[in-house]
């Protein structure tokens, strides 16, 4: 059987303002100073909170993702975020095709 990484992911939907997101990210980072080998922890906050959460989980073993991504690289797509934009904000994952977005 191939070695697989267990991915534990979560998001808080459209909840928490920036201050609440910062507090939650701080709590997550303190609660997870390390994770076992073969496990990856991922958090996907709302887009407006990505940079705040990124700054607070940088030193923790927590990956950052987005709740949605738009397929075009650039353009007049109000309210959307491209892969490059999310990557530049520190995201390494993204939820794609969630039933709430279809």
Model-based region annotation:
Residues 1-102:
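Active-site loop-to-helix "anion-binding N-cap" substructures in soluble metabolic enzymes
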């Amino acid at each position: 059987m191939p070695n697989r990484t267990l991915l534990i992911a979560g998001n808080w939907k459209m909840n928490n303002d920036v201050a609440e997101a910062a507090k939650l990210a701080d709590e997550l980072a303190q609660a997870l100073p390390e994770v076992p080998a073969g496990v990856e922890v991922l958090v996907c906050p709302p887009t407006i909170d990505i940079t705040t959460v990124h700054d607070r989980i940088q030193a923790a073993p927590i990956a950052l993702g987005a709740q949605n991504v738009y397929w075009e690289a650039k353009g007049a797509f109000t309210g959307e975020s491209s892969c490059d934009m999310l990557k530049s904000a520190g995201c390494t994952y993204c939820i794609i095709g969630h039933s709430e977005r279809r």
